[in-house]
């Protein structure tokens, strides 16, 4: 089912795939990593001026990784702000997504956390380094194929 935003993107020939609506009626779209920056700029111009959250998850063991963006269109006289959920899937072997920090400043720590936990590299992020784990940590703890070190290795890493 195509929503209002999907129709607008299609009208402007911006590549995407509608994924339907969530339980609250928020439209969900899939965007390819190589198209993400141009579509992010278009969404900002369209009025999505607030990045409510960005997160990432491991779709399946050995499968792709996903970076998820929840955008909100905020204006002064909106009782119900319009929202959209964007999903960008990348292969786990080379998980690269362009950073949207220059569009939404709130992406800074959120993209860093996704990098730290899942190893998604956000290209052109000015300070992409670990934010929760020590710099010496090896691996990506929230990947489903991650093998946790034993107790003594965890103690030695601090």
From Swiss-Prot:
A Pfam entry, by short name: Complex1_30kDa
Give the GO biological process terms: photosynthesis, light reaction
Q: Which InterPro entries match?
A: NADH_DH_suC, NADH_quin_OxRdtase_su_C/D-like, NADH_UbQ_OxRdtase_30kDa_su, NADH_UbQ_OxRdtase_CS
User: Which subcellular locations apply to this protein?
Assistant: Plastid, Chloroplast thylakoid membrane
Topology versus the membrane, per the UniProt entry? Answer: Peripheral membrane protein
Which reaction is recorded as catalysed by this protein? a plastoquinone + NADH + (n+1) H(+)(in) = a plastoquinol + NAD(+) + n H(+)(out); a plastoquinone + NADPH + (n+1) H(+)(in) = a plastoquinol + NADP(+) + n H(+)(out)
Q: Which GO terms describe its cellular component?
A: chloroplast thylakoid membrane
Q: Does the keyword Translocase apply?
A: yes
Keyword NADP appears in the UniProt entry: yes
The UniProt GO MF terms for this protein read:
NADH dehydrogenase (ubiquinone) activity; quinone binding
Q: Which UniProt keywords apply?
A: Chloroplast, Membrane, NAD, NADP, Plastid, Plastoquinone, Quinone, Thylakoid, Translocase, Transport
- Disulphide bonds in the chain: none
Which coarse location class applies to the principal site listed for this UniProt protein? plastid
Q: EC number(s) in its UniProt entry?
A: 7.1.1.-
This protein's assembly is summarised as: NDH is composed of at least 16 different subunits, 5 of which are encoded in the nucleus.
What family does the entry list? Belongs to the complex I 30 kDa subunit family.
Protein's name according to its UniProt entry: NAD(P)H-quinone oxidoreductase subunit J, chloroplastic
**Whose protein is this, by species?**
Cryptomeria japonica
Q: What is the lineage of its organism?
A: Eukaryota, Viridiplantae, Streptophyta, Embryophyta, Tracheophyta
């Amino acid at each position: 089912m195509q929503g209002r935003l999907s129709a607008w993107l299609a009208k402007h020939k911006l590549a995407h795939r509608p994924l339907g609506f969530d339980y609250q009626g928020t439209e969900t779209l899939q965007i390819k990593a190589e198209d993400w920056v141009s579509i992010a700029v278009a969404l900002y111009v369209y009025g999505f001026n607030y990045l409510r959250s960005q997160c990432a998850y491991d779709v399946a063991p050995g499968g792709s990784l996903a970076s998820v963006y929840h955008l909100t269109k905020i204006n002064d006289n909106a009782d119900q702000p319009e929202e959209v959920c964007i999903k960008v899937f990348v292969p786990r072997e080379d998980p690269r997504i362009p950073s949207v920090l220059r569009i939404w400043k709130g992406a800074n720590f959120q993209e860093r956390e996704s990098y730290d936990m899942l190893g998604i590299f956000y290209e052109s992020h000015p300070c992409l380094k670990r934010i929760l784990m020590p710099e010496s940590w090896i691996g990506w703890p929230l990947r489903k194929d991650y093998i946790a070190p034993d107790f003594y290795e965890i103690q030695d890493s601090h």
